[in-house]
From Swiss-Prot:
The keyword Nucleus applies. CDD domains: RING-HC_TFB3-like. This is RNA polymerase II transcription factor B subunit 3. GO terms for cellular component: transcription factor TFIIH holo complex. It comes from Kluyveromyces lactis (strain ATCC 8585 / CBS 2359 / DSM 70799 / NBRC 1267 / NRRL Y-1140 / WM37). Acts as a component of the general transcription and DNA repair factor IIH (TFIIH or factor B), which is essential for both basal and activated transcription, and is involved in nucleotide excision repair (NER) of damaged DNA. TFIIH as CTD kinase activity and DNA-dependent ATPase activity, and is essential for polymerase II transcription. The lineage of its organism: Eukaryota, Fungi, Dikarya, Ascomycota, Saccharomycotina.
Amino acid sequence: MDEDEKKDMCPICKTDRYLSPDMKFLINPECYHKICESCVDRIFSLGPAQCPYEGCDKILRRNKFKTQIFDDVGVEKEVDIRKRVFNVFNKTLEDFDNNQDDYDKYLEEVEDIIYNLDHGIDMEKTEERLRTYEELNKQLIMANLERSKQDVANFEQRQKFEKEMKLKKRLLEKQIEEEERANREWAKREIVNQLTVNEDAEEVIENVKKTVKLKKSSARRKLEELNKVLRNNPYMTMTNGRMKKKDTVPFTPFNGDRDLHKRYELVENEYNDSFIRDLQKKKEYIASGFRADFIYDRMLTEAFMGLGCIISEELQSS
């Protein structure tokens, strides 16, 4: 019997998915042995019992069984351990006064505990360490759990708010597009009508343009207000009633390393460089997508990119 057949067969009752397509497998976090739902109901319905796997002496309870999420039981076990440990060791960077070094040491300690529990290293000592920390920090753990729940609620509210605003924005943009199309059609007809009584074409066109400009729709004004609301999204700056500090990221000039408008022009389509010309003939370069015009373009970009870049002005606009 190959591994795929074993995967779809209950090791206790030997029923497989070929005969029972609706069969579900369950696992228990005590030992992570896979058992079909029928066997779980049959063996554990009267109360706790020993795991039916040969050589396993773990006592299992019916209410502890759950559906396996990951194909790899090792991954399933690690995820459960992480969930359990992080419910106890739930400090955040703010609890360390934003001291990254102290927070990193704390995370390293947590990872050591997870590793020991996952690999069965010093189990008694590690479990005792976990229990001791939980008893000594009950209030902090509960406060962080409540804060975490509040952060999740705020995130969901923010998602809902942004979704509603973006939907309104799309509707307004569609309305503006339709109004602009109607204004263009009206302008064409109006120019033709006015030219029948006024021979000065430039004056007619200018008057029609002014009229169209004055027809600035209420939808456009609403769109501008909506964009302001999105930029000043209250859910982006507040977390659980506290002002969220803006992430400190390195400032990158040149529009984020992207020069959208090239600061140079090539007078000639081709530049003759003997070294580059020889590379274009080599198969290993051609196979990798080598192109001489990309090389020249990159060299010129690097040479001209910093020209006209005033850091102080870019900092103000960023």
